[in-house]
């Protein structure tokens, strides 16, 4: 209690609505109960817990030895959309009296259910602090809207995954009030060991059932497409009947459409079928043993994509209800579960497999983190929550200073040798540029980027430039959605799995975009260069390596794993020289600056490089420019090497033309002017006649990487899209 400055126990109200949220809240409740010196626990039970058709699951809370302070009957029967709305309204009518009586310091609310929305709304309007469990996640249904609405009402957030944490930050929630703890249920899942699991299996599925030889099915209605979800449930039952394995079917939740799903079960005689056991509720301790030892789980419950991964049990996820969730390799998605055969094939593929344990959603230590977080809450702090919005003008009316400001971006280019930061105007003018040697270690590099950006932002104020955001161009494979460098090039050391967005955004309080340098060059051409107004074009960068970017229908193509446009690694020869990627015969192995330097050194070592009018100082390394100079001065061998390099690049372009059929190819970088004529010749000789009319040009942009990085920021401000 000394930690938060409170001079009394923290009164915590945990409100639970159904069997699913109790499985997440129970570990926290047990943790609170073990620390009576710090906490007082009040338990409020409402929703489907109190309905007989759904198993009267409030009894399991009593069996766990929790005193239920209040039972609220809040469900309006009908199982349709109107009934859900009326249930929220009924809860809003009843909750104020309860909260006035309990007077909690903080209410813990879980997830994305309509009951939880009523709880959060009531607490927020009554100035009660709210701790929201599992915010920031994405499922792909109406639940997302409810979950994010609760996030906006909540004062504190406990999330389960790094992505969820980033989503909360993107939603402008206060970083200091977000805890990445993992899922509380994983504390139980990862320690769940029951030697007598066979007795649990026999109790629910019969004496003749073996471990890993049965299925658990749990499917809920999709409230935005009830008709389709009922049809999908019917197909699922038909497939399970045909698959002919013992199956435990749990009744659906109370959402709109659940009544129709139960009718489907009864129409098909599932409750009396010898291969099926239909149940309204299974206690969580027993349920985890059942899924842990099942041959497969099928349905669309979040339990399948979240909790079951802890055991490596195969899961078949049907439809779109969990389409946005992060999943382990144990999950097979059947998004268009529109035929019985498709579902049956999925059962044949998954049943009986065993996958590694997945810890995407937790490591088993969530509850201690949450209790520590609760203890840190200072009740003396103002209740009003703060949002971390990017800086914007407070006054929307125009004044002369606003009109005279230059809308600009901070652009960062992480090259193999140098680190550059520039202030770039909306017109593509580089107002000021800073250059430093790129450090070799991760810590030094991040520190230098932050230092240079802070200095540039301060200078921008003096130059009357309004910085709208930060764009970063870097070598390697980049996930632009998360702002993370996944894998770097060999030229940039210690640069794998690096989150660039968060430290810069936290320091500068500006939005940050990150992308691969080849993609940035293509975006620069689209906004400022010869690609402006072009629907389809390809940019090839010729420098130390070979990179590129593809614009298709005005949009940049990233590919399914952010690996599109690795054009330098198109193979143009089966027995060509080794490439830095580990393959051989790539364009980069012939036409990059590194490749030309390699050939220049060979010639120099054999005294075949220098011709009359040339010299290389002893302290100067032989490089590509010496090879080019020798070729210009008539060195036949140097000319042959350049011709081979240009031919390799040309063959790569031909492959691109035959694949993408762009109307324009832009060669960029220091070597572009030396290759342009050779590339055009190769196209005339090797390409199909239908693509030979393509325009192949040399870029006229001086700093495409910086301009492309800036364009990510400047495009966002004008188009208002990410």
Swiss-Prot record:
Q: In which tissues is it expressed?
A: Widely expressed. Highest expression is observed in liver.
Q: Where does ADP bind?
A: 417-418, 420
Q: Consequence of mutating residue 420 to M?
A: No effect on UDP-N-acetylglucosamine 2-epimerase activity. Does not affect feedback inhibition by CMP-Neu5Ac. Loss of N-acylmannosamine kinase activity. Does not interfere with oligomerization
Q: Which reaction does it catalyse?
A: UDP-N-acetyl-alpha-D-glucosamine + H2O = aldehydo-N-acetyl-D-mannosamine + UDP + H(+); an N-acyl-D-mannosamine + ATP = an N-acyl-D-mannosamine 6-phosphate + ADP + H(+)
Q: In which pathway does it act?
A: Amino-sugar metabolism; N-acetylneuraminate biosynthesis
Q: How is its activity regulated?
A: The UDP-N-acetylglucosamine 2-epimerase activity, in contrast to the N-acetylmannosamine kinase activity, exhibits allosteric regulation by cytidine monophosphate-N-acetylneuraminic acid (CMP-Neu5Ac), the end product of neuraminic acid biosynthesis. Moreover, the activity is contingent upon the oligomeric state of the enzyme. The monomeric form is inactive, while the dimeric form selectively catalyzes the phosphorylation of N-acetylmannosamine. The hexameric form, on the other hand, demonstrates full proficiency in both enzyme activities.
Q: Name one GO cellular component term.
A: cytosol
Ordered alphabetically, the record's keywords are: Allosteric enzyme, ATP-binding, Cytoplasm, Hydrolase, Kinase, Magnesium, Metal-binding, Multifunctional enzyme, Nucleotide-binding, Phosphoprotein, Transferase, Zinc
Q: Where would you find this protein in the cell?
A: Cytoplasm, Cytosol
Q: What would you give as a GO molecular function for this chain, any one?
A: hydrolase activity, hydrolyzing O-glycosyl compounds
Result for mutant: residue 413 to K/N = No effect on UDP-N-acetylglucosamine 2-epimerase activity. Does not affect feedback inhibition by CMP-Neu5Ac. Loss of N-acylmannosamine kinase activity. Does not interfere with oligomerization
Q: Which GO terms describe its biological process?
A: CMP-N-acetylneuraminate biosynthetic process; glycosylation; N-acetylglucosamine biosynthetic process; N-acetylneuraminate biosynthetic process; N-acetylneuraminate metabolic process; UDP-N-acetylglucosamine metabolic process
Which residues participate in an N-acyl-D-mannosamine 6-phosphate binding? 416, 476-477, 489, 516-517, 545, 569, 588
Listed binding positions for an N-acyl-D-mannosamine are 476-477, 489, 516-517, 566, 569, 588
**Residues involved in Mg(2+) binding:** 413
Instruction: Fill in the PTM field for this protein.
Output: Phosphorylated. Phosphorylation by PKC activates the UDP-N-acetylglucosamine 2-epimerase activity.
Instruction: Show the active-site residues.
Output: 517
Q: Which residues bind CMP-N-acetyl-beta-neuraminate?
A: 259, 271, 280-281
Q: Where do the annotations place UDP binding?
A: 19, 23, 113, 220, 253, 282, 301-302, 307, 321
Binding-site residues for Zn(2+), renumbered to this chain: 569, 579, 581, 586
Region (N-acetylmannosamine kinase) spans which residues?
Answer: 406-722
The similarity annotation says: In the N-terminal section; belongs to the UDP-N-acetylglucosamine 2-epimerase family.
Role noted for this protein: Bifunctional enzyme that possesses both UDP-N-acetylglucosamine 2-epimerase and N-acetylmannosamine kinase activities, and serves as the initiator of the biosynthetic pathway leading to the production of N-acetylneuraminic acid (NeuAc), a critical precursor in the synthesis of sialic acids. By catalyzing this pivotal and rate-limiting step in sialic acid biosynthesis, this enzyme assumes a pivotal role in governing the regulation of cell surface sialylation.
Q: How does it assemble?
A: Homodimer. Homotetramer. Homohexamer. The hexameric form exhibits both enzyme activities, whereas the dimeric form only catalyzes the phosphorylation of N-acyl-D-mannosamine.
The protein depicted here goes by the name Bifunctional UDP-N-acetylglucosamine 2-epimerase/N-acetylmannosamine kinase
